[in-house]
Amino acid sequence: MKLTKKLLAMALAGVMLLTILTGCSGGKTGDRLVEEYMATFISENSVDTPITHDVPEIKTVADMFETSWLKADGSWNITSGNNSNDPKYKALKDIFASYKDSCTVTLVAFKVDSTQSELDQAMRVMMSSFYSGLPVYSSGGKTTAVKCATRLVTRENKSYRIAVIIYDHHAAG
């Protein structure tokens, strides 16, 4: 009986591992895997900085995402900056308003295809956040905590990776 339980436990563990590695357990697992890769990348550059994935606002952004937010070349079709009158940018600022005083909030979005692994997508998120991310809020100071979250959304039969990275400059340690 003990041997049977051990064999069943090992088989279940193998199936779970295979599910995670192949991404065959639904969109949430892929999202979480990209978040974990993002956190690993961030932790390499921000040693001893706590990193969480607690950004409920990403769901709101993913739900309201439209393909018109991106130009054909993949750059943002949203005008950002303090003087921006772009209603899409104002809506994003409202969504992330709780971070406005002491955080840097950067939004990233790009089209993905089925050949891109979660690792590839995470690397694109991180590189895009530096070069072509949409700055929602900017704040200076030492980073004391980081939050990152992502969602894969489908619009018009195309998939898009939406991600947010929030560098907190005031969190208590």
Language-model features: locations:
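Short N-terminal secondary-structure initiator segments
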Residues: 4, 24-45, 140, 157, ...
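Bacterial N-terminal signal peptides that target proteins for export
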Residues: 1-11
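A well-ordered secondary-structure block
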Residues: 89-173
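Short, well-ordered surface patches within globular domains
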Residues: 26-92
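C-terminal motif of bacterial Sec signal peptides marking the signal peptidase cleavage site
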Residues: 19-23
